[in-house]
Swiss-Prot record:
CDD domains xrefs: PheRS_alpha_core (cd00496)
Name the record gives this protein: Phenylalanine--tRNA ligase alpha subunit
Subunit note: Tetramer of two alpha and two beta subunits.
Cross-referenced InterPro entries: aa-tRNA-synth_II, aa-tRNA-synth_II/BPL/LPL, Phe-tRNA-synth_IIc_asu, Phe-tRNA_ligase_II_N, Phe_tRNA_ligase_alpha1_bac, Phenylalanyl-tRNA_Synthase, tRNA-bd_arm
GO biological process, one term: phenylalanyl-tRNA aminoacylation
Family under the similarity heading: Belongs to the class-II aminoacyl-tRNA synthetase family. Phe-tRNA synthetase alpha subunit type 1 subfamily.
Catalytic activity annotation: tRNA(Phe) + L-phenylalanine + ATP = L-phenylalanyl-tRNA(Phe) + AMP + diphosphate + H(+)
Subcellular localization(s) per the UniProt record: Cytoplasm
A family per Pfam: Phe_tRNA-synt_N
Species annotation: Jannaschia sp. (strain CCS1)
Cofactor names: Mg(2+)
GO terms under cellular component: cytoplasm
Cofactor comment: Binds 2 magnesium ions per tetramer.
Amino acid sequence: MDGLNDLRAGWLDRIGGATDEATLEEFRVAALGKKGEISLKMRELGKMTPEERQVAGPALNALKDEVNAAIAAKKAGLADAALDERLKAEWLDVTLPARPKRVGSIHPVSQVTEEVTAIFADMGFSVAEGPQIETDFYNFDALNIPGHHPARAEMDTFYTHRAEGDNRPPHVLRTHTSPVQIRHMEKHGAPCRIIAPGRVYRADYDQTHTPMFHQVEGLVLGRDVSMANLKWVLEEFYSAFFGVQVKTRFRASHFPFVEPGAEVDIQCSFEGGTVKVGEGDDWLEILGSGMVHPKVLEAGGIDPQEFQGFAFGMGIDRIAMLKYGIPDLRDFFASDLRWLRHYGFASLEMPSVHAGD
């Protein structure tokens, strides 16, 4: 057929010059569509003689295949070029560090509990635990707390309910960790040197009190244990905990489970609404302590004629507030992520005594 070479050259030239897939599709329809130029040429084969058709048919089919191949190749080239442009526009430096993911932090109470445990462990103390729901005996009777004591009042203590007709004393949410003393003495006897950190519960709620808080109990029993040992242990603890030398002051006080009993103050200064421990001329009450009452020893199965010892109890939340400048106890349990991110600790951050600082 006349003009096939020109037809071939024209379409290949136009296909090669297409700048986008839309233009390329227009060329495909114009060349190979139902009314396309090459398609119309194919229809003319029916008007030819067999001899002419034998020559023109293969030539037209070859042209059609070549144009189809050129369109496919051009389409692939345009796709590659578009991808290159996109990659340039969306280029990323894969050597840059990834954006850090938000991770949780260690709650100040958990951190301080670890610090307290580590310091006392360094002095030879082990950790003891007990149930948070206690019997009347372990929470009060065994600790020499009489039936008329104000601590037993429902306004101070959370009581559970017994079934109707059950006249046994109701269980309580323990008001202190002191019951662990009795349970440990019953099971392990004396001598002993333990601390008992854990949750305790009292019906109170204000800036410095919450219905649930954390306390650590300390108990040392031996044949020659004295108040002098108690003073040394507490001064060593506070100096290690606050990182400065801390002086203590003992004031005589009454607690049913110790005799004699003492409230312990630590040296501090009050400046601009902040408390600085270990300096100044002021004193801050920090815990209750004393020599374990003989009746408490007997309740735990210990002979008070053979063994004696001291005990103390302090609030973990309170010393956390002092050390880390936290103004309101209620914030510890408000589940405020902003507060937790500010006062929390990294998951791999060890207590200072573990790290050797």
